[in-house]
């Protein structure tokens, strides 16, 4: 289908969760299309039924929608070149393979599994790379006819040239050449009549008018075979953009099979969708020019600044700390109302007694990096944990258990004053500050013990007066009195 517009596609296999590397490929394909006012296509490649996972197609749809990577053509909305589910396109692939056979560019191979296993075993024993030896490559038309009439099982193989070089240009990796003698006669149609992944990929990309193929660098080695197929059919070769792998560390790739991070895992841990997408884009890509130092980008901003020349050849290592930092920045940029809406489900996991959630969130927002860590920070609200009075000792605040008892006893009448409005954080702080000044002490000497008395922890989302306002007068007084009793020992 001739087109003057850029057409990209994301063609996932429904094999489970959306892996970080897959989501990055989808994002880059989306950005490539949208930056050039082109068309972004979603195609489901479900021909490998052995790896098919029930419900995985819905995971793909949901992830793409949640992240805003909305497609212009796809299985659910259709388009001019459907169907967009590969298993629904099965009838055409064998026809194209047989066209190549008729033109002498592919051939029927009747070798049995047993023969191929023996061949590969011998090659391994000789220290060779396993490959097909071309046994059926030059069968006569009569020999082929006899095999077909006998109903012998067969595959259709691509007839790779034995001499010469196949080269291609990649936007990221530059010009690459491979000796044809190093390439195997790859299978196009399997014994069950189904196309192989590589063959279906080429045919579908051509028929759907894909102009730019964006995929992982693991497909670099297959690209010369792809190009020989395009040439065999006389089709235009697309622009290739191969992306570096996403690594867990210097030695290991992130992998769905090894249980590494998927988009769904990160959301379940409390990362924001926008932050995940932003971070994933920076895994192996960086903006140029005036945006070179910028790290926080909305999806529309990424569309604006996108350039495939920003993709690195080097593997990208998934850095959880960097993701945390970007997520924290997104949380800080939320309005108080937006933060409350996102934090409330996590607060409700830990707190089942009445508290001022709005005030709590005002304390949480500047401190929170990942929403999923909120519950463990709030486990003291429902019930006071056991703690040792040694927690009251703090060199910086110049407090001891003895001074803490004195401080809490001084605070008790301040916090008991019915005129003190616990919904006004500044008023409560100012009242406590005035008491510290009256005693000739620094604020921390008075307020550090209050925080311990209310939480039983050294680190909390907010200081002592913050916690008092969130808990309310009744619970605050109850815990301060209990702390004094504990310190009386």
Language model segments and positions:
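N-terminal Rossmann-like or analogous alpha/beta NTP/dinucleotide-binding catalytic cores
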Residues: 2-125, 222-235, 275
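Structural motif
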Residues: 20, 266-274, 313-319, 352-360, ...
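Residue-level signal for inorganic ion chemistry
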Residues: 29, 60, 100, 104, ...
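Glycine-rich phosphate/pyrophosphate-binding loops
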Residues: 34-46, 199-212, 233-247, 460-466, ...
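Conserved phosphate-binding loops in nucleotide/dinucleotide-binding enzymes
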Residues: 83-87, 110, 189-190, 208-219, ...
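Active-site cores that bind ATP or allylic diphosphates and position pyrophosphate for catalysis
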Residues: 102, 107-242, 248-254, 262
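Small-residue-rich helix-loop
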Residues: 336-439
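Charged substrate- and nucleic-acid-binding regions of tRNA-handling and nucleotidyl-transfer enzymes
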Residues: 426-488
